[in-house]
Regions:
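Short, well-structured N-terminal submotif of metal-dependent ribonuclease cores
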Residues: 1-46, 56-63
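Acidic, PIN/NYN-like endoribonuclease modules and their adjacent C-terminal/linker elements
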Residues: 2-3, 122-154
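A generic structural signal for short hydrophobic patches within well-formed alpha-helices
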Residues: 14-15, 51, 146
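PIN-domain endoribonuclease scaffold, especially VapC-family toxins
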Residues: 35, 44, 48-97
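Residue-level detector of structured alpha->beta connecting loops
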Residues: 43, 67, 111-114, 137
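Residues within well-ordered alpha-helices
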Residues: 59-61, 106, 129, 143
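Active-site neighborhoods of divalent-metal-dependent phosphate/nucleic-acid chemistry enzymes
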Residues: 76-131
Length: 154
């Protein structure tokens, strides 16, 4: 069902619907209703590493209720991850932390399927998704950019 997918969403963007976040669902109902619709239609997906990063029970439930398509990690994605962490952006993963970074897998999956990344991470940090996407010519946007792209006016 990847053929209909257009976007891959990061944990930071998913979390932004929480009541204490910038794009809280109680205020941005139409945005989240549209995202719900696009997740249900598999236009917005995520990858298994990003899904496993989600610790928030409300977001886990939201993903399940919406039927979030979670793309698996395969050899091509692994190869893309290797390229990202060894040549494109060595700062993306903190190897001293001794844990996997869902960010590299998210970007690698976006590259494989030609997806646009949706994230709320800072565009100015070298350890963040937007900088790496820029280096790899992968389209990346925050939720405001997403709203503009789909023509949503509040």
């Amino acid at each position: 069902m990847v053929s209909v997918s257009k976007y891959i969403i990061d944990t930071s963007a998913m979390l932004s619907q929480k009541s204490d976040e910038q794009y809280r669902r109680t205020v941005y109902r139409s945005l989240w209703n549209k995202i719900d619709e696009m997740v249900q239609g598999h236009e917005i997906v995520t990858c298994s590493e990003t899904a496993s990063e989600v610790q928030d029970d409300d977001i886990k439930k939201w993903m399940a209720v919406q039927g979030m398509q979670v793309l698996p990690i395969d050899d091509e994605v692994q190869d893309n991850v290797r390229e990202i962490v060894t040549t494109v952006n060595k700062d993306l993963v903190d190897f001293k932390a001794n844990k996997s970074s869902g960010d590299a897998f998210l970007i690698a999956t976006a590259k494989k399927y030609g997806l646009t990344v949706i994230t709320e991470e800072s565009v100015n940090s070298p350890r963040k998704i937007p900088m790496t996407c820029q280096k790899m010519d992968i389209k990346c946007m925050n939720l405001l950019g997403f709203m503009e792209e789909i023509g949503m006016a509040l």
